[in-house]
């Protein structure tokens, strides 16, 4: 496996059999202080390289376009995993083996949710607005409703994000 220099793996999720997860870190040489679309274009090669390092087929990567809302969608396609952009979506969930989920975050939090019993997982983009709207609760409710998950079985991991004392927040 290539270098994991720009990848963070979380021990609580790494302990779960069959779950591949990662938080791709910012590359210090890529300038992202610009418009969103330009920044995403600049990051594209870096992200593809990191996905390949993890053995993730980007043709099987579902993503949302992060609108700071509370919509969570199931990404369980018929006929196999697909590369899909889910518009107006901040959360994704699946039970499909080989279906990868991705969200982009800058200062917002990425919340990983995994159910080792039902072998379901979700990934949400949760900034201030999404947190106030209850996006993580929405994802858990969807997992309970669609996959029969018991909230007591869930492992939840919050990725690095802005927070006190480094930033003043009013939640």
Say what each PLM segment does.
Residues 1-171:
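Active-site microenvironment for binding and transforming phosphate-containing groups
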């Amino acid at each position: 496996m290539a270098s994991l220099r720009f990848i963070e793996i979380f021990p609580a999720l790494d302990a779960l059999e069959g779950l591949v997860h990662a938080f791709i870190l910012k590359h210090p040489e890529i300038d992202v202080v610009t418009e969103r679309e330009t920044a995403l274009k600049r990051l594209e090669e870096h992200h593809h390289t990191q996905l390949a390092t993890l053995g993730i087929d980007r043709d099987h990567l579902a993503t949302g376009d992060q609108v700071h809302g509370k919509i969570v969608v199931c990404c369980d396609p018929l006929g196999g995993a697909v590369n899909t952009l889910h518009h107006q979506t901040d959360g994704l969930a699946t039970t499909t083996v080989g279906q990868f989920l991705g969200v982009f975050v800058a200062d917002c939090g990425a919340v990983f949710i995994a159910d080792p019993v039902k072998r379901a997982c979700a990934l949400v983009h949760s900034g201030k607005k999404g947190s106030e709207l209850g996006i993580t609760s929405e994802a858990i409710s969807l997992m309970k409703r669609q996959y029969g998950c018991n909230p007591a079985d869930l492992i939840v991991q919050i990725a690095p994000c802005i927070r006190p004392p480094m930033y003043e927040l009013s939640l």
